[in-house]
Amino acid sequence: MISFSSFYQQIADSNLQHWLETLPAILGKWQREHKHGNLPKWEKVLNKLHYPAPDRVDFVSSVTVGTGEQLTPGEKEKLENLLRLFMPWRKGPFHIHGIHIDTEWRSDWKWDRVSPHISPLQNRTVLDVGCGSGYHMWRMLGAGAKRVVGIDPSPLFLCQFEAVKRLSGENHPVHLLPLGIEELPPLDAFDTVFSMGVLYHRRSPIDHLLQLRDQLRMGGELVLETLVIDGDENAVLVPQDRYGKMNNVWFIPSVAALMLWLKKCDFTDIRCVDTDVTALAEQRRTDWMPNESLVEYLDPNDITKTIEGYPAPKRATIIAVKNQPNQDLT
């Protein structure tokens, strides 16, 4: 069974220690609810990942664990077969003992767009909301973060993350907890909070921004990356049904509207540092994710539109700082 005890130990003497009043019970409940289904099967695969400590790790320019020279061809083939049991792999890529996990998303491209604009992560405590399988968490560690906590309720993402962590050979201060942000108390403790690719999935985007604010210390930095549309501060797209075949997209604001929302939630120093139309090469079908991907979500005759006729995915990165809260919003 996946254990969270090392995380409990690491935060016992930190500014996250009051989280221990509720977190073990919440995670215990999650484990009981998932003792059937796919999780036990994936945990059995995790228990087979007994390999020597890697001869090299790199979290600065990639997520690389081992060079592949330590394993025989047979051992490498066995490891690849085990890792394929965690398919589909959506966020990455990962390089594990010479095995290239070519994920659906080129998450490294997003990191290259975002990372030049954020405050240095050196010695920071970081929260990654909706972290997926943890690719960006490893890059945050590589950028010098003291501790990285990711939250995502998906059992598959948890197991993909655990696979990489176990193969990395060290007890790195990087932890994925299978939680949604609504299960977090107001911690007021993180130096930087990332929310990338989450806001448009939330039924109440203002509540999500307030939840993100509640996790930051005063003066902490929010890094928000989300879908946007063109338009002024009153422009917000609310898809009638699906957007890009997704039935869980609720609100897609303009950059101006999003910045207004952040101001209303008592963030300051709000700035848009990047906008980017998602390229077909950034999100695509691969051998490690053989299902439909972006090309199937767009109009085959006009890739500037989704299959439903909405503007094709365009993403913006907004950076803001937590200010003293307005009592009317809390």
Curated annotation (Swiss-Prot):
Protein's UniProt keywords contain Ribonucleoprotein: no
Top-level taxon: Bacteria
EC identifiers of the protein: 2.5.1.-
Reaction it catalyzes: carboxy-S-adenosyl-L-methionine + 5-hydroxyuridine(34) in tRNA = 5-carboxymethoxyuridine(34) in tRNA + S-adenosyl-L-homocysteine + H(+)
Keywords, ordered alphabetically: Transferase, tRNA processing
Enzyme type, top EC level: transferase
Protein residues bound to carboxy-S-adenosyl-L-methionine: K91, W105, K110, G130, D152, P153, S154, I181, E182, M196, Y200, R315
Matches recorded under InterPro entries: CmoB, Mo5U34_MeTrfas-like, SAM-dependent_MTases_sf
Biological processes, Gene Ontology terms: tRNA wobble uridine modification
GO MF entries: methyltransferase activity; transferase activity, transferring alkyl or aryl (other than methyl) groups
Record Pfam families: Methyltransf_9 (PF08003)
Acyltransferase recorded as keyword: no
Family named by the database record: Belongs to the class I-like SAM-binding methyltransferase superfamily. CmoB family.
Subunit structure: Homotetramer.
Job of this protein: Catalyzes carboxymethyl transfer from carboxy-S-adenosyl-L-methionine (Cx-SAM) to 5-hydroxyuridine (ho5U) to form 5-carboxymethoxyuridine (cmo5U) at position 34 in tRNAs.
HAMAP family for this protein: tRNA_carboxymethyltr_CmoB (MF_01590)
Name used for this protein in its record: tRNA U34 carboxymethyltransferase
The organism of origin for this protein: Shewanella sp. (strain ANA-3)
Native organism taxonomy: Bacteria, Pseudomonadati, Pseudomonadota, Gammaproteobacteria, Alteromonadales
Gene: cmoB
